[in-house]
Amino acid sequence: MPAHSLVMSSPALPAFLLCSTLLVIKMYVVAIITGQVRLRKKAFANPEDALRHGGPQYCRSDPDVERCLRAHRNDMETIYPFLFLGFVYSFLGPNPFVAWMHFLVFLVGRVAHTVAYLGKLRAPIRSVTYTLAQLPCASMALQILWEAARHL
């Protein structure tokens, strides 16, 4: 089956593919930022990296590096489930506009969460963006469960 036929087999799939690819790119950006912060703060996780950049005293932790790592871990805890849920949801035959809104709300919520986390924005901005992004995931999960249960 040609690639364009697979994409067109579900009207919601192109929107999911666009948003999920942007989210993966966002995760790469956070990883790059983490590396840049490590270099700027001279805080390396591995002795061989510290030796290369000034000596063993630079094998240490740093609060800003730890913040980047927490942001990345939070991405993994939320984006990986979204990739599964969104893919399956795309094949349930959802209204294309509603599907777009699910995917877009998650994407915007996660980007805003990263900005809030790395930018050290005041509370409760980060928790609001986290919750906002989780709402479409909960909706998709419930719809998947409902459809799966109906077909038992």
Swiss-Prot record:
Compartments, record wording: Membrane; Cytoplasm, Perinuclear region
Induction text: Induced by the interleukin IL1B. Induced By p53/TP53.
One GO BP: prostaglandin metabolic process
Keywords, alphabetical: Cytoplasm, Fatty acid biosynthesis, Fatty acid metabolism, Isomerase, Lipid biosynthesis, Lipid metabolism, Membrane, Oxidoreductase, Prostaglandin biosynthesis, Prostaglandin metabolism, Transferase, Transmembrane, Transmembrane helix
Lumenal face residues: 1-12, 91-95
Listed result of changing S127A: No effect on protaglandin-E synthase activity
Activity: how regulated: Induced by interleukin IL1B.
Membrane topology: Multi-pass membrane protein
Effect of R126 to A/L: Loss of prostaglandin-E synthase activity
Residues at which glutathione binds: R38, R73, N74, D75, M76, E77, H113, Y117, R126, S127, V128, T129, Y130
Record bears the keyword Transferase: yes
Transmembrane segments: 13-41, 61-90, 96-119, 124-152
Residues annotated as site: Essential for protaglandin-E synthase activity: D49, R126
Impact noted for substituting Q36E: Keeps about 40-50% of prostaglandin-E synthase activity
The reaction(s) this protein catalyses: prostaglandin H2 = prostaglandin E2; 2-glyceryl-prostaglandin H2 = 2-glyceryl-prostaglandin E2; prostaglandin G2 = (15S)-15-hydroperoxy-prostaglandin E2; 1-chloro-2,4-dinitrobenzene + glutathione = 2,4-dinitrophenyl-S-glutathione + chloride + H(+)
Entry function: Terminal enzyme of the cyclooxygenase (COX)-2-mediated prostaglandin E2 (PGE2) biosynthetic pathway. Catalyzes the glutathione-dependent oxidoreduction of prostaglandin endoperoxide H2 (PGH2) to prostaglandin E2 (PGE2) in response to inflammatory stimuli. Plays a key role in inflammation response, fever and pain. Also catalyzes the oxidoreduction of endocannabinoids into prostaglandin glycerol esters and PGG2 into 15-hydroperoxy-PGE2.
Name of the featured protein: Prostaglandin E synthase
Organism classification: Eukaryota, Metazoa, Chordata, Craniata, Vertebrata
